[in-house]
Amino acid sequence: METILGFTAIAVALLIGMGALGTAIGFGLLGGKFLEGAARQPEMAPMLQVKMFIVAGLLDAVTMIGVGIALYMLFTNPLGAML
C-alpha cells in the first residue's frame, strides 16, 4: 500500500514539474518569436500581440489541466482501493 502511494506521489510531482518546465520553455520560445516578428515588421506588432496572448492562454490551460489531473491522482487514488 505504501509503495503505491509513494509511486503516486512521485508521478504527481513529475506531472506538475514537467508541465511547469514545458510551459516555461514554451513561454520563452513564444516571447522570442514575438519579439523577432515585431522587430521585422513593426506594423504587424498589434496583431502578433493578440495572437501571442491567445497562444499564451492555451499554453497555461494545458498546464492547468495537468495540475488538475495530478491533484485528482493524489487525492482519489484508484489503486489504493484495490488492495
Curated annotation (Swiss-Prot):
Q: Does the keyword Nucleotidyltransferase apply?
A: no
Show the NCBIfam families listed in the entry.
Answer: ATP_synt_c, PRK06876.1
- Principal localisation: membrane
Protein family according to the UniProt entry:
Belongs to the ATPase C chain family.
> What does it do?
F(1)F(0) ATP synthase produces ATP from ADP in the presence of a proton or sodium gradient. F-type ATPases consist of two structural domains, F(1) containing the extramembraneous catalytic core and F(0) containing the membrane proton channel, linked together by a central stalk and a peripheral stalk. During catalysis, ATP synthesis in the catalytic domain of F(1) is coupled via a rotary mechanism of the central stalk subunits to proton translocation.
Q: List the residue(s) that the UniProt entry marks as the site Reversibly protonated during proton transport.
A: D60
Molecular-function GO terms, alphabetical: lipid binding; proton-transporting ATP synthase activity, rotational mechanism
User: Which residue ranges traverse the bilayer?
Assistant: 10-30, 52-72
Intracellular or extracellular location(s): Cell inner membrane
Annotated Gene Ontology cellular component terms: plasma membrane; proton-transporting ATP synthase complex; proton-transporting two-sector ATPase complex, proton-transporting domain
- Report the gene name: atpE
Subunit structure of this chain's protein: F-type ATPases have 2 components, F(1) - the catalytic core - and F(0) - the membrane proton channel. F(1) has five subunits: alpha(3), beta(3), gamma(1), delta(1), epsilon(1). F(0) has three main subunits: a(1), b(2) and c(10-14). The alpha and beta chains form an alternating ring which encloses part of the gamma chain. F(1) is attached to F(0) by a central stalk formed by the gamma and epsilon chains, while a peripheral stalk is formed by the delta and b chains.
Please report the record's description of how this protein sits within the membrane: Multi-pass membrane protein
Q: Which keywords does UniProt give here?
A: ATP synthesis, Cell inner membrane, Cell membrane, CF(0), Hydrogen ion transport, Ion transport, Lipid-binding, Membrane, Transmembrane, Transmembrane helix, Transport
* Organism listed in the record: Shewanella amazonensis (strain ATCC BAA-1098 / SB2B)
The record's annotation in Pfam families points to: ATP-synt_C (PF00137)
Q: What is this protein called?
A: ATP synthase subunit c
